[in-house]
Amino acid sequence: MTTVTLPTVPSPPHSRDGADRRLPLPGRYTVAPGRSLVELTAWYGPLPVLRRRVTLGEASLTVPEGAESPSFRFEFDDRLFSAVLTSEEVDEVHGGRLQLTGDLDLNGLAFPVLLRLRVVQRADDRLLVVGHARPPYRLLRRATGFRLPWRRPATRLRLLVAAEFA
């Protein structure tokens, strides 16, 4: 019996140009007016009972130089839904997605929320993302006092966000 040694294929070197990164190069990026879409949907069981576009007042992405976590900030400015979503932790998950754990600041009270973003397009100076958060309406109402119109019963909300950071 003979032993055969097979050649090993070396692993490819890590990309130096950041092709495997999900975020743009370090810096601060904002969303230009008209380059975003935000929608608030209230659900009662399987039925959507309210669907409304929400104005995105300002949004920013800060990518630090080191190994620190980037930070996202979304300011929603609407008469029905005026809030600020600030990320505390940003994780890269499988399939080119980002998972933001942060606080939704409504009426001066912070409510924890999970925003899942899909990276649609990435360049060195630009990032296009689409994602959603699904906070439970009853807990949000009890914790922050946020209320929908009384004719709109709801069990959960969906906040849809699409933005191009440049």
Predicted regions and their residues:
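Low-complexity, acidic/polar, glycine-enriched regions of mature
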Residues: 1-166
